[in-house]
Amino acid sequence: MRIFDEPTETKMPDKIPLARDEVRNYDILVTRPIFVKNILDEVGTGLHSRLQKIILKTGDEWQRRLTVVQANITNLNMHDRYEDFKTVSDIVVSYAEKMGSTPIKCRTSDCWGVLYKKNDFAVAHAHWPNIWSWGYYVKVPQGSSPLVFPEGKEGNYYVFPQVGDLVIFPAWIKHEVPPANVDEDRMLVGGNIERIPHKDLPLPSTEEIKNVVAPSTNLVK
């Protein structure tokens, strides 16, 4: 897994004062990592097949009440209800923990299954206040709708998923799925990931403490 973080060189005026006593939006250049990888071999065909069966069996537990996702969607606690969903969630977390500028310990906050039928769609939305959101693609018929990130600096970014693909992206960026134009169903497992607070983590071992790199004392003056 390679992380590329190459900031764009842009000449900006300095010393811009910020407003006080109010919430205001500012344009700040921030790169947003998105990770796409096929993990079907890691998940295994057995687990992959069971995920599909569970999504089909569970059906639409929201009865189209979710306005942002107009498709059949399960409740958001599938990782607590089914060991298979927990297993795939844990695999995703192992990747997500390495995606930030510094490694952090994470856990699944939500996990669900989605089945898109013909003409189903998801309007642009985000999953704040989670850190990461993700999708693992269980069934992707030929001609399926892409996953779209509509607010890219250079235009819309598209992911045309394949069966077994995993897509991890920052939870606060908007994403959408255009209406499906194929007759076959499109299925995925979705999830959100949150940071584990330090108070919930075990104390480090003596060996881990020894391996901590001490900060440099050569301060720039």
PLM region spans:
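Positively charged, low-complexity intrinsically disordered regions
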Residues: 3, 21, 126, 208-212
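Alpha-helix boundary/capping detector
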Residues: 77, 190-193, 215
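Catalytic core of non-heme Fe(II) oxygenases with the double-stranded beta-helix
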Residues: 104-178, 184-188, 192, 196-199, ...
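Non-heme Fe(II)/2-oxoglutarate
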Residues: 2-103, 220
